[in-house]
Amino acid sequence: EQAKAELGIPAGEKLVVSVWGSLGAGHMNEVMTELIPMLDGKQGFRLLHAAGSRYYAGMAEKLGETAPDMAEHGVELREYIYDMPRVMTAADLVMCRAGASTISELCYMGKPVIIVPSPNVTNNHQEKNARVLEAAGGAKVLLEGEFDAQSLLADVKELLADDEKLKAMSAAMTSLAAEDATERICGIILDTIHKE
């Protein structure tokens, strides 16, 4: 609750964080550009969307026309999230890609997640990463092109309406965390050095 207070979010209000990498993701920004005008301030949650440096200006301009009251409706649009630890601590639900660093952090923090794996990666590794989280019960996986803004919003609302489901997802994510990853990696490096 302290992280929410620092972000100006009232106690008890839920926060959804939508983040798609530092450059952003064109398809997901298109979906979010359609979704944000659907929020009327009565949706029961706040949304923080990071558009990425490549897409921020165009998205801000478009939403200035289609959702001029978005701030009053609980929506914050950012180019980039510079205070990521605070924002992720405050998040009740995260929407993102499935890169290894991202999902490692989400597991460590125990954050329920809606994952849209990038289709533009080698050997489809993001979907493979996402399916591990899904199988454990920590993530809902959506594939690009198989959903739209309306169905994504419905998924968000459904998850946020079920506190027990969010708790179970959080526990599932935490169960996958490798809290000693640094020590294990260093151990492997040292073992390799000593063998040579």
What is the meaning of each model-derived region?
Residues 5, 165-179:
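A short, well-ordered alpha-helix in the C-terminal region of glycosyltransferases
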Residues 7-94, 127-130, 135, 142-151:
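Donor-nucleotide binding loops and adjacent catalytic segments primarily
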Residues 22-25, 54, 118-122, 175:
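Short histidine/acidic/glycine/proline-rich micro-motifs that form metal-
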Residues 33, 149-153, 182-190:
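Short, amphipathic alpha-helical "lid/cap" segments that border enzyme active or binding sites
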Residues 35, 62, 155, 169-172, ...:
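A ubiquitous structural signal for well-ordered alpha-helices
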Residues 84-126:
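A donor-sugar binding/catalytic signature common to diverse glycosyltransferases
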Residues 134-141, 150-159, 169-172:
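Amphipathic alpha-helical segments at domain termini/boundaries
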Residues 158, 178-196:
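C-terminal alpha-helical cap of glycosyltransferases
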